[in-house]
A protein has these predicted regions:
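Extended, helix-rich architectural segments
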Residues: 1-160, 164-166
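Intrinsic disorder/low-complexity signal
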Residues: 81-84, 172, 178, 192-193
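Short, hydrophobic/aromatic-rich segments at coil-to-beta transitions
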Residues: 109-111, 169-176
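Helix-boundary and N-terminal cytosolic regulatory elements
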Residues: 164-167, 171, 181-183
Length: 196
């Protein structure tokens, strides 16, 4: 894959990135919001006057409060789930206890998904399982090899494609994610049906 393909953006990403940046800055508030320069300019206002007005405008963070109130309401009563035949399964219990392989349980991860969806209007959730050379299910259980969740915010998922299976269903066959970017480098992951 060449540099041009890696820099390509999905048309929906291009259409929404300014909104997503506004939403997260509104949620974070403070200097993040001020630095977005979202105040409307007055018709005859000079750039210096506008900068001074932005600098002296108080930024009360009501967006964060609203998201947190809704989140606390939704998660006040823990969800109940029916796992059917999987109830009590070792790998399921391990997943529920550490859903993201960073020590956070499933409810905590899903609470973050809900908060991101409240901020951005959507978010991406990837469920993956490490590739291994184990030969049996018992070996996987012994090594705690199991699925895990990764949460991606929409500004980091820059390109994707859905294909139609022979059954008629759509499935994701291509995904480009920016994991980290700074002045010196960018870490970009490309997911296809064949490889990551």
């Amino acid at each position: 894959m060449n540099r041009k393909q890696l820099q390509q953006k999905h048309e929906l990403w291009e259409a929404n990135i300014a909104n997503w940046e506004f939403y997260i800055r509104s949620y974070l508030g403070g200097n993040d919001y001020k630095n977005g320069y979202y105040l409307n300019r007055y018709i005859l206002e000079s750039p210096e006057e506008y900068d001074a007005r932005v600098k002296h405008t108080p930024v009360d963070n009501h967006c964060k409060n609203v998201v947190q109130i809704y989140t606390s309401f939704l998660w006040r009563v823990p969800p109940t789930r029916d796992y059917g035949d999987l109830d009590g399964d070792e790998s399921l219990l391990s997943f529920l206890d550490d859903a993201d392989l960073d020590g956070r349980n499933f409810n905590t991860v899903m609470r973050e998904v809900q908060m991101n969806a409240s901020i951005y209007g959507n978010c991406w959730v990837i469920v993956d399982k490490p590739q291994t050379v184990t030969k049996t299910r018992a070996e996987e259980l012994a090594q705690d090899i199991r699925p895990y969740i990764s949460i991606l915010t929409p500004e980091n998922v820059v390109d994707w494609n859905y294909a139609r299976a022979s059954s008629g269903r759509f499935y994701l066959d291509y995904l480009v994610v920016i994991e980290d970017i700074n002045a010196e480098r960018a870490i970009v992951k490309v997911f296809t049906e064949e490889l990551i």
